[in-house]
C-alpha cells in the first residue's frame, strides 16, 4: 500500500466549517471526498509538527482536528529530519519562517514516505520549488516525496 504524509492543511480543511470562499469550499469538498474514498488505500502518517500545528488556535477547532489525527501513526522528528529541514531552508531556499513546512517535507523524505498530501502551495506543493526540493533531498541521500494536493491523488479511471 502506498504511504502518505498528511500535512496540517489537510486536517484543517477536514475539521473546518464550510467556507464561504468558493476556492476554499471546493478544496474542503475535495479533501472530504479524498478522505472518504481514497484514504483507505494509503498508509497515512503525521509528525509531531502536524500535531503541534493542529493543537494551536481555537480550542474547539483544535479538538476537532485532534480527533481526525488520532490513530494516524506518528513519524519521529530525528536529527536527520532536522538536518534535512535545515538544508531545505538554506538550499531551496525557503524563508526561515517556513521551518514547519521544511520539517514536513524532511519528515516525509527521511522516513521514505511516497506522498506528502497538502494544500500549502506556497512552500510545499509548489511547481517552481519542487525540482529544488527534490534535488536537496536527493543530494542529502533521501528520496523526495511526491508533493501533491488531494485532487492529484484521486486515482485513475481504471482504479
Which residues does each PLM region occupy?
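Short, well-structured N-terminal submotif of metal-dependent ribonuclease cores
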Residues: 1-46, 55-66, 72, 90-96, ...
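Short secondary-structure boundary segments
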Residues: 8, 48, 119-121
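C-terminal end-helix/capping segment
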Residues: 125-146
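Short, C-terminally biased terminal segments at protein or domain edges
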Residues: 141-159
Amino acid at each position: 500500500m502506498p504511504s502518505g504524509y498528511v500535512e496540517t492543511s489537510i486536517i484543517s480543511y477536514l475539521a473546518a466549517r464550510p467556507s464561504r470562499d468558493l476556492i476554499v469550499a471546493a478544496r474542503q469538498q475535495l479533501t472530504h471526498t479524498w478522505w472518504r474514498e481514497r484514504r483507505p488505500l494509503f498508509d497515512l502518517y503525521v509528525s509531531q509538527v502536524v500535531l503541534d500545528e493542529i493543537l494551536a488556535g481555537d480550542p474547539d477547532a483544535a479538538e476537532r482536528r485532534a480527533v481526525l489525527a488520532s490513530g494516524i501513526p506518528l513519524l519521529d522528528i530525528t536529527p536527520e529530519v532536522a538536518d534535512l529541514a535545515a538544508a531545505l531552508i538554506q538550499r531551496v531556499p525557503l524563508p526561515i519562517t517556513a521551518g514547519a513546512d521544511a520539517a514536513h517535507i524532511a519528515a516525509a523524505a527521511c522516513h521514505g514516505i511516497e506522498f506528502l498530501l497538502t494544500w500549502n502551495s506556497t512552500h510545499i506543493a509548489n511547481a517552481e520549488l519542487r525540482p529544488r526540493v527534490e534535488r536537496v533531498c536527493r543530494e542529502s541521500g533521501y528520496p523526495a516525496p511526491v508533493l501533491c494536493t488531494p485532487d492529484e491523488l484521486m486515482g485513475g479511471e481504471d482504479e
